[in-house]
Amino acid sequence: MQKVKEMIGSINELDTKAQQQMEQHLNTLTKPLGSLGLLESLAIKIAGITGHTQPEIDPATVIVMVADHGVAAEGVSAYPSEVTQQMVHNFITGGAAINVLSRVSNASVQIVDIGVNGTLQLPGLINKNVRHGTNNMAQGPSMEREEAIAAIEVGIEVAQAAIQNGAKLLALGEMGIGNTTASSAMLAALEQVPVEQIVGFGTGLSHEGKEKKVAVIKRAIEVNQPNAADPIDVLAKVGGLEIAGLAGIVLGAAAWRIPVLVDGFITAVAALTAVRIAPLCVHYLIASHQSVEPGHVCVNKLLGLTPLVNLNLRLGEGSGTAIALPIVRSAIRIAHEMATFEQAGVSGAIEDVGKEK
């Protein structure tokens, strides 16, 4: 827990001076004030995150945390548990959606085994396995508290290693059959939200399957009685190893003043967990998209984040972050490369036109 405490103590507020300077700079560029909307807000936010008036977000790295879930035995997913391991092979060989989308958006991808139910020895795979999958949370705690903390610390270590290797932006990705169930349970427990309001169809459940998923989550919460005031207790009782690891990435990135691009529902719950551990983390988050999962709408609202796009995604893997990365990059390039009115020899606005006297 010492490493987690160190991160909490290292996370600061945004640099308001850098934000003000960025806003002033944007207001001198050859465009009407505020006319680039969310792009300008992004540039100002990233200036505040990094503390630089000319921030950089490249190289960008997508970190995909992978783990299995014991609750999958309850039949809460449309796919069998072995798909988790099979997808790791797909990630490593470059055939998954996140690989393709990251190539398009010029981001590197790291795959981390933090809790796969098996032993994988694959070139390029980062082996940080805390335990071989969680227990079935419908019957008892997903893991021990110490294991949840260990998984958070793995995330911190992975984030710091990526940053030390040059990453200027970290994007969150995940894979784990059953992890929408764990994420829904965590959100319901952390925020006292009715389970029915946040559970979606996951990877393609039927209406009957969705009802079963709701019942399993309710049973898990009843059996484990997670403490809403203690996010690590919630993680340990109804969470997942990859969710804990992703929360650690957020903590590590925030401590190093690095922006975090959040993907879909699972990564958003991980980010919410990090914010419940260290509230200042919220300033370092950028929501890449709004997925079709109803719980994702809820989490983005809780975090106060405005998603950059809505493409009806429900994949995970970090896919939304790779799609949104060029938008974030555009915000930075606007600040770096647009000419000012003075540089371009363009006349500014007529001060009194349209204003009440």
Curated annotation (Swiss-Prot):
Keywords: Cobalamin biosynthesis, Glycosyltransferase, Transferase. Its EC number is 2.4.2.21. InterPro entries: Nict_dMeBzImd_PRibTrfase, Nict_dMeBzImd_PRibTrfase_bact, Nict_dMeBzImd_PRibTrfase_N, Nict_dMeBzImd_PRibTrfase_sf. The keyword Manganese does not apply. Pathway: Nucleoside biosynthesis; alpha-ribazole biosynthesis; alpha-ribazole from 5,6-dimethylbenzimidazole: step 1/2. GO terms for biological process: cobalamin biosynthetic process. The active site is at residue 317. It is an enzyme of class 2 (transferase). Gene3D superfamilies: 1.10.1610.10, 3.40.50.10210. The keyword Glycosyltransferase applies. One of its GO terms (molecular function) is nicotinate-nucleotide-dimethylbenzimidazole phosphoribosyltransferase activity. It catalyses: 5,6-dimethylbenzimidazole + nicotinate beta-D-ribonucleotide = alpha-ribazole 5'-phosphate + nicotinate + H(+). Catalyzes the synthesis of alpha-ribazole-5'-phosphate from nicotinate mononucleotide (NAMN) and 5,6-dimethylbenzimidazole (DMB). PANTHER family: NICOTINATE-NUCLEOTIDE--DIMETHYLBENZIMIDAZOLE PHOSPHORIBOSYLTRANSFERASE. Belongs to the CobT family. NCBIfam families: cobT_DBIPRT, PRK00105.1. This is Nicotinate-nucleotide--dimethylbenzimidazole phosphoribosyltransferase.
